[in-house]
Amino acid sequence: MGLRFARDHPWGRALAHVSAACLHLVFPTPCRLCGGALDPGRRSVVCGPCWAGLPRIGEGGCPCCGKPYGDPAVLAASPEHRCGDCRAAPPPFDIARACLHYRDEGGGRPLVLAMKYGGRPGLAEALGRRMADEASARLGEGTFDLVVPVPLSRRRLRERGFNQAALLAGPIAGRAGVALDVRSLRRTRATPPQTGSAAARAANVRGAFALGRPARIAGRRVLLVDDVFTTGATVREGARTLLAAGAARVTVYTLARAD
């Protein structure tokens, strides 16, 4: 009880920050990507130059799902031009945005795989802080009032030991000053890892989510957070479930996105 009080009390949190800074000076933590020194003022495991050098997603993509366009002339001719996927099957979410390209070149995909399968929850939290840094620029100010991570099945959570989406979502909610809800959206069944075509992925997650606390969602502008947007099947199904429970709108934010 005493330790918990000390950790939750403002003085306890301040002491923890000072202790962490002192430990960093004595035993500096290297960047998980390059091994270089980290800024002790930032609670991160990825240095600024490495983050800046990752394959970033810039402006110039589908205004709905954020899919990058190879030819910038597409948006120049029609700023509201939606990609073929969004025109063929309009998504239930308002917009989706991501920070990194999910590909081997540049390190985006290896970074995500290391976070998910390398037993590195600290890396997920650090990347969540980087996502929080960019949330306003990518999503707009005041666009959500509740953050919900895509849940794992109980079996997958036991195997991995953590839900990377929840660890990414925590810093985003904290920076925005809104609640993080990790209990309302839940998996109704374990699903195999997402592979194959868009249709196969959609079938794999159809009906895989449910709301445990619908009243918590009703009327809220929800930010749905996940690690990777590939075809969008998982976040589409999650968004449908949230909207069926009465969410006012759903915005999607992922660490990475497949081209």
Regions found by a protein language model. Give the residues of each.
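Glycine-rich phosphate/pyrophosphate-handling loop used in enzymes and phosphotransfer proteins
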Residues: 1-226, 230-259
